[in-house]
């Protein structure tokens, strides 16, 4: 994206001595690159958290800490398996798109990454299976035990950062997302008690809804950690701006997932099988 010259920036030429500007000056290319960057870096933070919980389970001398880590990891596992693999597909598709037609041939290596990412949503349980595991077994059957653990983490972090002026723009939407997550889960549970099909109808949207909030938490923590570190200003800015993009452009996806969940199972089950 920094090397390929194509068209001129809408605001005027950036490289007047060249026949065109690099495609990274175009907003839509930035959208694709930032989406891939935000999902990938956030996913790494979540995956490392999962690994740290495994260490606690295997190594801690504190029985209560081991149990807490096990309950939390049990809840997060389908999110890690389901969301991270789907986001890998999205990120690799955006990267391939930035290459244009050249990305579709073997020379760039991008097509291999796209194919490798795609299979991850199938093996080790498809996305639909991970979603059912999250909503059915790990949330409703446990009365939301793992969810409560994670919500407690969010509340504690938001409370800790309330007076930090660098975190204001992230804390308010994160705290609201936590409240909405709890209320939506209760509503699904109520509906499932009346119609078990609601679990299957809501599960995939609930998986992504949960995943985006989990990643919002890790992006907020990443910004707080970066700002408190001795890293160069350029590093801190990159974290802050990527987090801002995530909160303003990707976290709002939860709203469409919530709307789909609340529309109910009827629109999925009404059509006769013969019509497909």
Listing of model-derived features with the role each one plays in the protein:
Residues 16-25, 62-69, 187-199:
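Short, charged/polar, low-complexity loop and linker segments
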Residues 18-20, 28-34, 64-80, 112-121, ...:
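Short beta-alpha connecting loops at secondary-structure transitions
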Residues 31, 35-38, 79-82, 176, ...:
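DHp/HisKA dimerization-phosphoacceptor four-helix bundle of two-component histidine kinases
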Residues 41-44, 83, 126, 130, ...:
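Residue-level signal for the membrane-embedded core of alpha-helical transmembrane segments
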Residues 141, 157-276:
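C-terminal amphipathic alpha-helical interaction region
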């Amino acid at each position: 994206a920094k090397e390929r010259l194509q068209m001129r920036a809408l605001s005027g030429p950036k490289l007047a001595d060249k026949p065109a500007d690099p495609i990274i000056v175009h907003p839509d290319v930035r959208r694709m690159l930032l989406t891939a960057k935000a999902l990938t870096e956030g996913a790494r933070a979540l995956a490392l958290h999962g690994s740290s919980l495994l260490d606690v389970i295997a190594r801690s001398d504190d029985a209560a800490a081991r149990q807490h880590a096990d309950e939390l990891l049990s809840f997060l596992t389908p999110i890690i398996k389901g969301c991270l693999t789907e986001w890998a597909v999205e990120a690799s598709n955006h990267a391939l798109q930035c290459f244009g037609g050249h990305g579709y041939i073997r020379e760039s290596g991008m097509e291999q990454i796209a194919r490798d990412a795609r299979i991850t949503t199938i093996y080790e349980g498809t996305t639909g299976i991970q979603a059912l595991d999250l909503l059915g077994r790990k949330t409703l059957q446990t009365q939301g035990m793992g969810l409560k653990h994670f919500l407690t983490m969010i509340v504690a972090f938001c409370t800790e950062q309330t007076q930090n002026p660098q975190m204001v723009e992230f804390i308010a939407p994160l705290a609201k997302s936590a409240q909405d997550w709890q209320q939506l889960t209760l509503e699904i549970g109520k509906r499932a008690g009346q119609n078990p099909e609601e679990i299957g109808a809501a599960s995939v949207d609930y998986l992504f809804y949960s995943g985006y909030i989990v990643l919002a938490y890790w992006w907020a923590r990443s910004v707080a950690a970066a700002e408190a570190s001795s890293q160069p200003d350029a590093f801190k800015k990159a974290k802050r701006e990527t987090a801002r993009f995530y909160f303003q452009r990707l976290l709002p996806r939860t709203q469409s997932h919530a709307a789909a969940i609340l529309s109910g199972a009827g629109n999925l089950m009404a059509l006769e099988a013969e019509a497909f």
